[in-house]
């Protein structure tokens, strides 16, 4: 393969890939890919035996009067030489109160078990109560392993001179299990601080008691990145936590419950299950997760918290929460991954205003685009792929807030506004600069602002929600947000408008039911889009309103019992309407004011028929909402201009008379609507070019005057002449025969075709054919004629008459001699010879009660 060929193929492949990527970007987000986590937590098993030691045996004072830290540490040290992957060391702390004056260190394969009623009390001002020993100094997850802490109480017991501390700290290890433990009383730190641990289970524990103002989590999941983030745990290698199960715990009387308030850029916490926990009386956030992915947060109860769940891939103050990787920023964008793959479901949440959250919200998903950042690479740190489903949320502020995210699904939640508490003017569901977000099948009740607010972004869907009593609008779309769909929602008793599209936003609004809004059912004000198949009833002003909106379509909506108009347009609005229905609107069906315009559809299927020399008829399809139609005409001259020639208010056709033959005219039709103050015109139909014809009336023919009766249809070949021109059959005209079988007068109608119109009628006779029973031979010498022949069974008799010589059409000068007996032709002969000179003769017979004559001979 040549270099040129390889280059061409590579370029073509690159172009194809670009097209595919652009195409994929047009599709809706595939929510089926959001599966959450399969986290299993700590996996501690496989021991063949266990050794048990008791701290009292090492001199621990269970009355708490003496320092027991040395005794307890000796018991823990027993695991150094005696514990292994096959032998677990169980260190038992009996019921009692144990004072420790310095921190404790725990080693691999240790089960530290506190019996019911056992409490370890911290009695020093600096540092944690217990940490893993870091015996080998390894990084990653390679230090301690298989540590269990179970039962009892760990009391941080801060004093007035205490420095910030964590009750427990664990890092660079694998498999940590904390269960059925009460951990209480911390000052400006964490109850449990975990960094760089893989395999974590924390269950059935009780976390409470906190002093200080720092917003720190009771359980902190962290990366080991530097001495500021996780001091005393070298090496600093950015190891994150992975595979954590935190379930069935209690968190109360704290600022924050659990999570991560910092992260290393490009490093993610993965596989976290937070389930069945209860959080209550928390002035801050129950769960804060920065840079987490593959999470499930389910079946938790969160009561009286300032914020329930805060999920972020960037923060407002990025330099405070995100730090530089130890490997630096080289190749950092290859390590960034915005797919969160997280599920938040079946949680029961009540949020209230607090010191830290004066404007509370239940759930936040937050991303941020950095441009010209002084601390981190410029990048859109967005969040994708989160489901928020089946939650019960009661809020004194907002329920769900989304910033710079995409692929978020908010479905089947029961969200209500708490009017019984001090509350705040916020939107229930708030979207900012977010795209491909679906808000569906939620029950949204109350709020002082909007039930669903969208600003910026594109491709969002708000569908099949039940929305009641929003303070402002049920759905409010603003800030240039594009390609939004609002469908199938039921909105009642909005404090302002049911649905509002404004500030250059665009939306397709369809199949919604909006009732009893204080103002309009649906309003476009400075926005654009289409409203179709909506039901708008009993609203305080109009059902549909276009206010200074340049491009709006109202199709097939039902506007009933509104206190204003069915449809209203004002200022510079341009509104296309079709198929709308109206009933019992107090002020009327359609009202247009200012420089607004209601634009009807252009008439379709404009056709011409009955085209003739001086007239023609136009027909077209009916235009919905039209009160009538204007018809315009011009000639095809280059400088000709359309002139209105008719206003049709009855039907969809018009006949134009007084036209000039063989002249081309151009027509167009436009629907109009008679609103309250003025006539509104629709769009023009397509131009229809038509040429008038010549009339065939007055034409002549060379048709024969008679033809013989044969019992079959008689037709002729003849020419038709108009103005000296010979017409071409089946091009310029066609013929239609009638009465052209039986004896009598046949009719021929010549009908114009092509450039000819109208018709002309002609006639010819059909007569019985002569029987040739008589032959008349005039003889000039004796002025007599000889009549001879044979009788015929067809004739019943004969007429013989004197004829005017040399004339085809004879005139009878005397009564003819009638011979009734056709079997005796000799009588005819004799009579003729005796009485007549020049004769003519014809046969006759009775046929269906009428005398039918043959041709004269």
What are these regions (language model features)?
Residues 100-103, 122-127, 158-166, 187-194, ...:
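Short glycine/acidic-rich loop motifs that flank beta-strands on beta-rich extracellular proteins
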Residues 656-675, 834, 838-847:
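Beta-strand-rich modules
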Residues 614-625, 786-795:
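Conserved aromatic anchor
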Residues 84-128, 154, 183:
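N-terminal extracellular ligand-recognition/capping segment immediately after the signal peptide
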Residues 674-692, 847-857:
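Extracellular fibronectin type III
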Residues 55-92:
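Acidic Gly/Asp/Thr-rich repetitive segments characteristic of extracellular carbohydrate-active
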Residues 726-757:
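Serine/threonine-rich, repeat-prone extracellular segments and beta-strand-based repeat modules
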């Amino acid at each position: 393969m040549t270099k040129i060929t390889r280059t061409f193929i590579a370029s073509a492949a690159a172009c194809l890939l670009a097209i595919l990527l652009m195409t994929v970007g047009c599709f809706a987000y595939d929510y089926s890919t959001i599966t959450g986590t399969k986290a299993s937590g700590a996996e501690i098993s496989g021991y063949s035996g266990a050794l048990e030691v008791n701290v009292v045996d090492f001199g621990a004072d269970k009355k708490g009067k003496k320092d027991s830290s040395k005794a307890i540490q000796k018991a823990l040290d027993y695991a150094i030489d005696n514990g292994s992957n096959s032998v677990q060391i169980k260190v038992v702390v009996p019921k009692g109160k144990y004072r420790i004056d310095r921190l404790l260190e725990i080693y691999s394969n240790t089960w530290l078990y506190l019996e019911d009623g056992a409490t370890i009390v911290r009695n020093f001002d600096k540092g944690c109560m217990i940490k893993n020993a870091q015996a080998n100094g390894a990084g990653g997850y390679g230090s301690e392993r298989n540590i269990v802490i179970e039962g009892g109480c760990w009391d941080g017991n801060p004093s007035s001179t205490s420095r910030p501390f964590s009750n427990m700290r664990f890092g660079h290890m694998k498999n940590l299990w904390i269960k059925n433990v009460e951990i209480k009383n911390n000052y400006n730190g964490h109850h449990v601080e975990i960094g760089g641990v893989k395999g974590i289970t924390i269950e059935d524990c009780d976390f409470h008691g906190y002093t200080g103002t720092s917003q720190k989590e009771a359980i902190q999941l962290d990366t080991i990145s530097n001495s500021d983030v996780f001091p005393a745990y070298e090496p600093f290698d950015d190891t994150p936590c992975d595979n954590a199960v935190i379930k069935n715990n209690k968190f109360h009387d704290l600022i924050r419950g659990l999570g991560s308030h910092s992260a290393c850029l490009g490093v993610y916490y993965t596989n976290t299950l937070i389930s069945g926990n209860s959080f209550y009386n928390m002035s801050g956030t129950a769960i804060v997760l920065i840079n987490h992915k593959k999470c499930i947060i389910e079946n938790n109860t969160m009561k009286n918290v300032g914020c329930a769940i805060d999920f972020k891939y960037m923060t407002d103050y990025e330099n405070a929460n995100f730090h530089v990787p130890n490997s630096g920023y080289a190749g950092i964008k290859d390590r960034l991954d915005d797919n969160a793959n997280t599920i938040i479901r079946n949680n029961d949440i009540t949020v209230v205003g607090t010191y830290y959250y004066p404007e509370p919200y239940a759930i936040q998903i937050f991303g941020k685009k950095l441009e010209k950042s002084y601390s981190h690479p410029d990048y859109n740190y967005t969040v994708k792929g989160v489901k928020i489903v089946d939650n019960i949320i009661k809020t004194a502020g907002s329920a769900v807030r989304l910033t710079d995210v995409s692929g978020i699904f908010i479905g089947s939640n029961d969200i209500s506004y708490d009017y019984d508490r001090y509350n705040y003017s916020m939107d229930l569901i708030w979207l900012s600069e977010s795209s491909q977000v679906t808000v569906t099948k939620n029950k949204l009740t109350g709020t002082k602002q909007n039930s669903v607010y969208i600003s910026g972004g594109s491709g969002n869907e708000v569908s099949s929600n039940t929305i009641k009593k929003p303070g402002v609008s049920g759905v409010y779309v603003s800030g240039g947000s594009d390609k939004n769909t609002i469908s199938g929602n039921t909105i009642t008793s909005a404090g302002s408008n049911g649905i509002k599209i404004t500030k250059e936003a665009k939306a397709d609004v369809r199949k919604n039911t909006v009732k009893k809004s204080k103002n309009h059912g649906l309003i476009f004000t400075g926005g654009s889009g289409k409203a179709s198949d909506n039901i708008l009833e009993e609203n305080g002003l109009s059902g549909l309103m276009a206010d200074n909106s340049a491009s709006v379509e109202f199709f097939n909506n039902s506007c009933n019992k509104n206190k204003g108009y069915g449809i209203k347009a004002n200022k510079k609005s341009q509104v296309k309407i079709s198929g709308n229905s109206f009933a019992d609107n107090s002020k009327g069906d359609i009202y247009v004011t200012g420089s607004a315009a209601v634009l009807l559809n252009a008439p379709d299927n404009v056709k011409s028929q009955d085209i003739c020399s001086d007239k023609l008829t136009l027909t077209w399809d009916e235009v919905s909402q039209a009160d009538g139609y204007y018809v315009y005409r011009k000639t095809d001259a280059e400088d000709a201009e359309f002139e209105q020639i008719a206003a049709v208010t009855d039907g969809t056709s018009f006949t134009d008379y007084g036209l000039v033959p063989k002249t081309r005219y151009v027509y167009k039709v436009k629907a109009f609507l008679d609103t309250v103050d003025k006539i509104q015109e629709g769009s023009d139909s397509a131009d229809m070019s038509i040429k008038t014809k010549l009339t065939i009336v007055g034409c002549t023919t060379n048709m024969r005057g008679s033809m013989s009766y044969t019992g079959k249809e008689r037709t002729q070949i003849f020419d038709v002449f108009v103005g000296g021109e010979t017409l071409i059959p089946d091009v310029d005209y066609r013929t239609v025969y009638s009465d052209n079988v039986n004896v009598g007068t046949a009719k021929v109608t010549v009908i114009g075709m092509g450039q000819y119109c109208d018709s002309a009628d002609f006639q010819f006779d059909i007569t019985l054919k002569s029987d040739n029973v008589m032959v008349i031979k005039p003889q000039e010498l004796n002025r007599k004629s000889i009549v001879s022949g044979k009788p015929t069974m067809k004739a019943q008799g004969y007429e013989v008459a004197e004829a005017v010589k040399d004339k085809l059409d004879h005139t009878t000068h005397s009564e003819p001699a009638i011979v009734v007996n056709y079997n005796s032709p000799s009588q005819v002969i004799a009579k003729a010879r005796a009485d007549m000179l020049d004769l003519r003769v014809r046969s006759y017979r009775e046929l269906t009660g009428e005398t039918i004559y043959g041709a004269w001979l």
